């Protein structure tokens, strides 16, 4: 079937066979299908949708467009975790060592930050000397030796997704649930883990803005993973306000270490405990309550922090900075953002805070932009807190000439009120193949 006919079929609401999806995706990767044809087809998908079966097949075709990682040289069940992204979302740096300290192998491939959301690999590289580009042999050997490695995602994984995402980004087809689900799950299937926990963030700092949208996406991704023989669960977590207090690369590493040392912010600690417990459940380690207790125990006895240091040391990192934060690269300047009035913080838009941190140099506005590892923001007041005029809302770190623009961006998402806003839950729901459990 010609690509023209396949575009017309989806435009008219038809359902594609696997062979048709292979023709579209593989044709696009090889160059036989032009950008304008792929853009037309994706817009047809955006407008007409896909069946769950169709989306599962598309995901598998996309996964097989590149390298399929075989983790069988690593014995035992391997559990992966993926977050749909957010501001101050440093959970991987906390939960990977917790789960590994509980005896479950973590062979994780993570990404870099783009736009207002940060990336795990950028955060890891703020620890001086840390290598995130390991060979497959080094990666497998480290996981077999210490039970944990987090590296940058291979360029060869889900090749179709890279091309399709870049095109979606410029053709107004990003916010399409079948295309989002196939994008995320194609990379997860290709990465080779036996079980996958999805952290689907929701709110202003997340891609999905409502809980219902997030649940719809989570159900589809769980269905795709289950269809392909993986154990999958998804947590719906809040991202209306950043997790923890720190946004920025080395700043988020410091805060993650605080959680592993048992002295981190309550919200970040709670979300990490729930994520870690659900990963352990997927690995068959026990009931949710038993697995939560295991996670708490390895924080309390110091073994989770020790495992994190062991990972950084194995990958060349200077682990002294994890104990003494003054050894991190220091910011060029600091700036205190002061409250302009008395009142409760009714809204503290996470996306605006993330964008402000990017303006300071903590993130990228386009691929390839250099990072200032010391740049970022520490929040002193968050949604629901009462502030007095002149009190510090946040400390900005970075080059002094960037503070004015960053402060304007931050304040554009700040709303004061006379009454304390209702507290939002940290976790809204758990989605498994058996259904949705709302909290």
Where are these regions (language model features)?
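Acidic, glycine/proline-rich low-complexity segments that act as flexible tails and inter-domain linkers
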Residues: 1-88, 309-318, 433-434, 439
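Well-ordered secondary-structure scaffolds
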Residues: 5, 17, 28, 68-69, ...
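Short, small-residue-enriched loops and turns at beta-alpha junctions
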Residues: 14, 28, 46-49, 85-87, ...
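Alpha-helix C-terminal capping segments
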Residues: 47, 93-107, 187-192, 227-228, ...
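Glycine/serine-rich anion-binding loops at beta->alpha junctions
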Residues: 77-100, 104-116
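General beta-strand structural signal in soluble alpha/beta enzymes
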Residues: 106-110, 132-135, 150-153, 197-200, ...
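A glycine-rich helix N-cap at a beta->alpha junction
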Residues: 123-149, 219-225, 229
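Phosphate/diphosphate-binding glycine-rich loops and adjacent basic-rich segments that engage nucleotide
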Residues: 144-193
């Amino acid at each position: 079937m010609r690509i023209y006919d396949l575009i017309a079929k989806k435009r008219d609401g038809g359902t594609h066979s696997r062979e048709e999806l292979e023709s579209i995706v593989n044709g696009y990767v090889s160059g036989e299908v032009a950008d304008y044809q792929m853009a037309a087809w994706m817009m047809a998908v955006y407008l007409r949708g896909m069946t769950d079966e169709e989306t599962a097949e598309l995901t598998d075709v996309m996964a097989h467009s590149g390298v399929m990682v075989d983790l069988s040289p690593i014995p035992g069940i391997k559990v992966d975790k993926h977050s749909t992204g957010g501001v101050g979302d440093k959970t991987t740096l906390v939960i990977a060592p917790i789960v590994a300290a509980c005896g479950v192998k973590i062979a994780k491939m993570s990404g870099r930050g783009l736009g207002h959301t940060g990336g795990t690999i950028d955060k890891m590289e703020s620890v001086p000397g840390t290598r995130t580009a390991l060979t497959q042999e080094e990666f497998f050997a480290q996981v077999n030796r210490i039970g944990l490695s987090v590296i940058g995602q291979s360029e060869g994984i889900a090749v179709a997704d890279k091309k399709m995402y870049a095109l979606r980004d410029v053709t107004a087809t990003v916010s399409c649930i079948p295309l989002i689900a196939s994008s995320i799950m194609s990379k997860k299937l290709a990465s080779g883990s036996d079980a996958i926990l999805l952290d689907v963030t929701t709110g202003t700092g997340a891609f999905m803005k409502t809980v219902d949208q997030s649940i719809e996406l989570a159900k589809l991704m769980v269905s795709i993973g289950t269809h392909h023989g993986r154990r999958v669960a998804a947590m719906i977590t809040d991202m209306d306000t950043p997790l923890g207090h720190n946004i920025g690369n080395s700043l988020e590493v410091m805060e993650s270490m605080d959680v592993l040392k048992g002295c981190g912010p309550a919200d970040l600690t709670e979300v990490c405990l729930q994520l870690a417990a659900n990963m352990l459940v997927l690995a068959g380690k026990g009931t949710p309550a038993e697995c939560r207790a295991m996670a708490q125990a390895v924080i309390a006895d110091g073994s989770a922090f020790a495992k994190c240091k062991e990972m950084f040391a194995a990958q060349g990192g200077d682990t002294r900075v994890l104990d003494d934060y003054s050894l991190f690269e220091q910011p060029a300047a600091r700036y205190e953002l002061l409250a302009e009035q008395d009142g409760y913080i009714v809204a503290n838009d996470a996306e605006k805070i993330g964008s402000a941190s990017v303006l300071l140099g903590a993130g990228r506005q386009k691929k390839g932009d250099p990072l200032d590892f010391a740049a970022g923001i520490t929040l002193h007041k968050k949604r629901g807190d009462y502030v007095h005029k002149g009190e510090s809302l946040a400390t900005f770190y970075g080059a002094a000439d960037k503070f004015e623009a960053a402060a304007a961006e931050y304040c554009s998402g700040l709303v004061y009120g006379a009454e304390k806003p209702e507290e939002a839950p940290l976790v809204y729901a758990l989605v498994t193949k058996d259904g949705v459990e709302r909290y």
